[in-house]
Amino acid sequence: MDNEQFLICAEHTGQYTFPLVCACKSVECKLWLENPSQIKYSSGMQRGKNDKVDAKRIAIYASRFGDKVKYYDRPTEEIERLKQLERERALYVTDLAKYKGQMYDQKDFMPAALYRKKTKRMKGLIQELQAAIDAITAEMEKIIGSTEVLARQMELLMSIDGVGKVVALNVIIETEAFSRFDNPRKFCCHAGVAPFSYTSGSSQHSKNKVSHRANKNIKKLLHMAAVSVTHRKEGELKAYYMRKVEEGKNKMSVINALRCLLYTSDAAD
């Protein structure tokens, strides 16, 4: 059989699927990467788990739900490079915050001589991490600047109130330059900011709520952008926030609406 007649279905495990993606591309074989939760909850009650059983469940899922197949399209080289660099940058940013916290949390409880030695070592680590972060940021900016589409998208994103470089960059990466999602609602669901109704059974009197099945990193970034809007003195989104609060809306609900508006504004542009 020709390789093009084969379809490989696998769970999408983020960066760990990269070797499989490369292998399928090299032999020109079609690849379907599915959300692990989608496979899990469509397989009924499960007992026991190992690689052999998991492989069988994935094969059964692919056989039963062939109408849901979505062939994997590899992102552009620029997007892949940005993804890898952003993962590395985020790792260093987390470590940097950790070491900065360690600089002062024990200051009043340690012998002065011991604290000075600790501080000296910490400062060295902090400087190295900051240098690495700056180098990665410069490389990412170079990639964006050399790609007309990405540069234009970055410019449009940063023209929106509350959206800075980090938020704009992560939106571009997560949406793969606005090619991954068909409409803003799908991205809002992915980011965990789209409200859903819960009106059946014991939940029939519940208010609309967001789902916890979300990309928590992009949700956090959108939240920070929305909160920054509330601290602005003026602007279209600030006016929207003030108007809804004056109408008696819950502030957190309005902030969640701002999270959605930030992306729908992006998509509209």
Can you say where each PLM-predicted feature lies in the sequence?
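Conserved small/polar residues in nucleotide/adenosyl-binding loops
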Residues: 263-269
